[in-house]
Amino acid sequence: MKTLLLTLVVVTIVCLDLGYTMKCKICNFDTCRAGELKVCASGEKYCFKESWREARGTRIERGCAATCPKGSVYGLYVLCCTTDDCN
């Protein structure tokens, strides 16, 4: 019985990904370079993409965030997501 309990504990620890962190695109332009992902800090649970218009055209910022950012004064669109490379 003790062996079974120990086995279950070990399997549970192995199956849990206790150190998982998000990976998001990080860039401040219209497009990101392929494969350019950043490992977010442990408290950052969201990837975001915000776009807004300025004199030179539409700008896009992508990154990691602890909470979903609200649109700025100039913000047209904010996308928040919780899976790797979703922004």
From Swiss-Prot:
Tissues with expression: Expressed by the venom gland.
Major place of localization?
A: secreted
Annotated InterPro entries: Snake_3FTx, Snake_toxin-like_sf, Snake_toxin_con_site, Toxin_cobra-type
SUPFAM superfamilies, from UniProt? Snake toxin-like
Q: Subcellular localization, per the record?
A: Secreted
> What would you give as a GO molecular function for this chain, any one?
toxin activity
Instruction: Kindly list the cysteine pairs connected by disulfide bridges.
Output: 24-47, 27-32, 40-64, 68-80, 81-86
Query: According to the lineage, what is the superkingdom?
Result: Eukaryota
Please give the Pfam families that the UniProt record associates with this protein: Toxin_cobra-type (PF21947)
Report keywords, A-Z. Acetylcholine receptor inhibiting toxin, Disulfide bond, Ion channel impairing toxin, Neurotoxin, Postsynaptic neurotoxin, Secreted, Signal, Toxin
Give the signal peptide as a residue range, or say none if absent.
1-21
Relate the protein's function as given in its record: Binds and inhibits muscular and neuronal nicotinic acetylcholine receptors (nAChR). Is a reversible antagonist of muscle nAChR (alpha-1-beta-1-delta-epsilon/CHRNA1-CHRNB1-CHRND-CHRNE) (IC(50)=10 nM) and a potent and poorly reversible antagonist of the neuronal alpha-7/CHRNA7 nAChR (IC(50)=50 nM). May exhibit differential affinities for the two binding sites on the muscle nAChR.
Protein family (similarity comment):
Belongs to the three-finger toxin family. Ancestral subfamily. Orphan group IV sub-subfamily.
- State the protein's name: Candoxin
Task: State the species of origin.
Answer: Bungarus candidus (Malayan krait)
